[in-house]
Amino acid sequence: MLVHKPSFSTSLPTDLDGYREAYSETLSMADEVRRVTGLEVGVVLGPHPVVWEHQIEPLGLSASTELHLEAVSLALDYIEEGNAICLGEVGRPHYPVNEETWTSASELLLEVMGMAAAEGCAIQLHVEDNGETTYREMAQLCDKAGLPRDRAIRHYAPADVSPEFTNGLAATVSVGKGSIEGLVSTVTSKSAPWGMETDFLDDSRRPGAVLGPKTVPKRTQELCSTLLREGWEEDDVSNLMDSIHREWPKRLYSIL
């Protein structure tokens, strides 16, 4: 999965043409990877919520919100054309903001979810880490917007995949150190679909950030061996790995 990320080190898009150019760069990058490596590359495309928040001061809340929604609509056009497969990252700022901004962020996300639901499109969420409360609030927004909860994929999720914690939302878990213990203690047959992620940036200024690309194979092996030690049957472990790395991603990152 190649996820569109704004370049905060350069100027952020201030109009729809700017977003069109930024999206095109990500899509071109995906084409290059396919051509050079022969790998399948799915693109997650959309305006980042942090960009929206950063642009409130220079553009004003109304203009920043209008631009964000236009950028969502543009991303959905690319998705409909088959150039991308998921809307994201969308969501809320993951850091403290004032009450007006926070309320506006939730209202904006509700509208974005409604747009995705209308297109039968999954979304990848960039949200704050406030434990089960974050999941519960996201689930409530999904229900209001008519977006199935398992079509909202929480990015950089904590290693708790119990249904009581996730409230039925899908998740890609950041598989850093200590994550396997959390997964082993919370995974059940009732868990919503989830996967593993590194949030790898390929940024020369932050080498290896957030986690290196070899992390997922390493954690997969660690998860398998730990589950077997915990008494899981080999077939059950194999089926779970097939779900994590094939079935669930194929289902989550698709157009229904």
Model features per residue range: what roles?
Residues 127, 156-157, 173-175, 198:
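Active-site proximal loops enriched in glycine and acidic residues that flank catalytic Cys/His/Asp
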Residues 129-132:
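Gly/Ser/Thr-rich loops at beta-strand to alpha-helix junctions
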Residues 153-166:
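Class I S-adenosyl-L-methionine
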Residues 166-169, 190:
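Short, structured coil segments at secondary-structure junctions
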Residues 188-203, 254:
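Conserved short secondary-structure transition element at the edge of the structured enzyme core
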Residues 229:
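Conserved phosphoryl-transfer catalytic core
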Residues 1-119, 125, 136-145, 158-160, ...:
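Mid-domain alpha/beta scaffold segments of enzyme catalytic cores
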Residues 149-152, 169-177, 194-196:
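Short hydrophobic/aromatic-enriched beta-strand-loop microsegments
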